[in-house]
UniProtKB/Swiss-Prot annotation:
Domain of life, source organism: Bacteria
UniProt similarity note: Belongs to the UPF0303 family.
SUPFAM superfamilies from the UniProt entry: GlcG-like
Species for this entry: Brucella melitensis biotype 1 (strain ATCC 23456 / CCUG 17765 / NCTC 10094 / 16M)
Protein name as it appears in the record: UPF0303 protein BMEI0598
Any single Pfam family the record assigns to this protein: HbpS-like
Intrachain S-S bonds: none
Lineage, opening ranks: Bacteria, Pseudomonadati, Pseudomonadota, Alphaproteobacteria, Hyphomicrobiales
Length: 169
């Protein structure tokens, strides 16, 4: 199958993820539980990552595991800005933009210092409220960052993570 076809299938699956992974509500306890779930997976699998769960105006959870770097924290900020701007998964945008330079097209006027075209950011969509924040992971290859977030969010909201997972690249 051609790369373009693979991307189209992955984009379709990510859209399904975004439509299925709706939180009934989200408060500080939910954010802590979700963040701890991601951290537990990372520690068990020895993944060096940074994790951020934030609403538009307020951080609810942050953690880093052994192996994460200061750069990962900066990537969290830049991925968060992308989710805040577009209200969709950052990996979906990576596949839709399909740019080797990993920068947004110039007409979008998004400074690379503030916006990262990289997977690992996922919108927090609350039933009846819409997108209110983002769950972000940084430290793995971008598809793996995305998959880790989707797995944890799916488990948290009672969806089947296997049914929602992207196929191996």
């Amino acid at each position: 199958m051609a790369q373009g076809d693979d991307n189209k299938q992955a984009i379709g699956q990510i859209i399904r993820q975004e439509q299925a992974l709706i939180f009934p509500s989200l408060d500080e306890n939910d954010a802590f539980s979700l963040g701890q779930r991601i951290r537990d997976i990372a520690v068990k699998d020895k993944l060096g990552i940074a994790i951020d769960i934030s609403l538009w105006g307020r951080r609810l959870f942050f953690a880093a595991t052994a192996g994460a770097t200061a750069d990962n924290t900066e990537w969290l900020r830049r991925k968060f800005n992308v989710v805040r701007r577009f209200h969709v998964s950052t990996y979906r945008l990576v596949l839709e933009q399909n740019r080797e330079d990993r920068m947004f097209a110039p007409y979008k006027a998004l400074d690379v210092a503030d916006y990262a075209l990289a997977g690992g950011g996922f919108p927090i969509r609350v039933s009846g409220a819409g997108v209110i924040g983002a769950v972000i992971v940084s430290g793995l290859p971008q598809r793996e960052d995305h998959n880790l977030v989707v797995r944890a969010v799916a488990e948290h909201v009672g969806q089947d993570p296997v049914a929602l997972a992207l196929p191996a690249a």
